[in-house]
Each structure stands twice: as structure tokens, then as C-alpha cells.
């Protein structure tokens, strides 16, 4: 059975990692010196945090990396018992081979409970001579300050367009795909700097056709073209509520989009709208209110229709 492309084309070593050149340079220095502090990787999903941790372990340990590296997903195992059992049992044993220390990688560590984080802090202190921790999180503010102060913090930003394009073209060439310019632009738009999402969309589109086009990408990603969103917002802003609502329903039915997806795309269009700064502020407030109501369980169609109605009377 074929691997998902995100795993098939995951970089094996630090020099292969796409983007984040300054971060990779610092991690490479740790490998060369065989010495490093505890690390905290923060950033949005799909920007290379897990890949960097795995590549670091493989470069540091070589063939014995599996014996000296433990990966746990904290969103699945987020309680204090995991820290007291799995983490502590692995941390207290000596490294295999000539490795100076073991590495424990806690993915999504911002999901750990407060008690678990306090237990982790004590474990980090107790076994710091033979074990290093790499913590990965989306929201560093959810990591308690005592842990943050014990780590070197690396902030992974969304990947640049040129890095995404280069990697997508490389994968397309290896998979003998024809990647059209419109297809690339569409993947860049829907992925928003998330390499994992970009590769998944490319693989899904490739299952439909060997030629990846703009239309196919938006279909498989369940996203509307930016011009479809622009058309709806312009109709609403010009007071054409009925036509705007019809466009909204077409997006939800024809494209299978959720209200949240449409709201995010409308929000992304706000800076480009030909309205005053004051009107943009009021529009963002209305979008925020609509988002809150949808998250709380209100009917998506009613809330989005109300948003379109408000857009027609912006002051």
C-alpha cells in the first residue's frame, strides 16, 4: 500500500528540510557539537516542527535513532500518568551506543494538563544529564513559564510561497504529474503556508487527474475560488442582498463548504475590499460576531445571511 505523500517525501535529514534556514542552521550546530538544551518548537500546524525534530534525531544518532528517541502525541496522552510512566521510564535509562543523551519529543505539548506540565518540569530537571526534551506546540502561551524558561524557543513561521512551490514541483516531477500554474496558485491559496496541507491537496488532486488544474484543486480542497468570494462580498456591499445570499447558498451546496470555511475566506478578502478603513473595522467586528455564534452552535446559513445583510448597511 502506498504511503501518504507527506510521509513518503518527509525530509530525512536537517539539510533536506524545506525553509526555516536560520532554525535549521542552529539545529545543525547542536548536532555537530553533540550538545543541546531542551527545545520548544512553536508554530501553526504543518510548518515543519515534527519534521525538524525527527531529522535532528536521525542526524544526531544515525542508525540508533529509534532506540534513543521517543515520540509522544500529548493531545492523545495528555494526563499526568503519561509523564509518570512512559516519559519517566524512557528518561531514566541510559542512551544506546555513544549517544550523549536521549531525546523525548512531545508533540502538541500545549494539550498537556497543568498537572502534567508540572510533573514534566520536575522530570526535565531530574534527568537533564541523560535526556533532552523537544516540545512542539501551536500555542506557546499554554506552556507554563517554568518549562518555557528551561527551553531554547524556536518559532516556526508559515512557509514562504517560493519554498512551497519548489517542493510541490519536486514532488510532481517524481510522481510524473503535470502541475499547471493555476493549480500551483490554488494550492498555495488553500494551504496558507502549511506544507502538510499543500502536499495532501496535491495527492488528492493527483488521484483525480494526472494534470493538476485550478478547478480540481478547489474542488478537492472544498474551497471556493477567491473570485467567487469576492463576487459574493461585492454583491452584499452594494446592497444586493438576495443575489449575495444566492451566491452564498451556491457555495455551501455546490462546493460543500462549511460556514466556518466561508467565513475564513471572507475574512481573508477584507484587506482587499474597496471600502474605507472604518467600514473594514466594522466588517471584521461583524465577522467575529458571526464566527462566535456559529461556534456556539447557531445555524450557519442564518448567521452568514445576517452577515451579508450587515455588509449592505455598513457605516
Swiss-Prot record:
CDD domains per record: AAA (cd00009), HLD_clamp_RFC (cd18140)
Family matches, as InterPro entries: AAA+_ATPase (IPR003593), ATPase_AAA_core (IPR003959), DNA_pol3_clamp-load_cplx_C (IPR008921), DNA_Rep/Repair_Clamp_Loader (IPR050238), P-loop_NTPase (IPR027417), Rep_factor-C_ssu_arc (IPR023748), Rep_factorC_C (IPR013748), RFC_lid (IPR047854)
Keywords: ATP-binding, DNA replication, Nucleotide-binding
Entry keyword annotation includes Transmembrane helix: no
Source organism superkingdom: Archaea
Function: Part of the RFC clamp loader complex which loads the PCNA sliding clamp onto DNA.
Assembly description: Heteromultimer composed of small subunits (RfcS) and large subunits (RfcL).
Listed name of the protein: Replication factor C small subunit
Organism: Methanococcus maripaludis (strain C5 / ATCC BAA-1333)
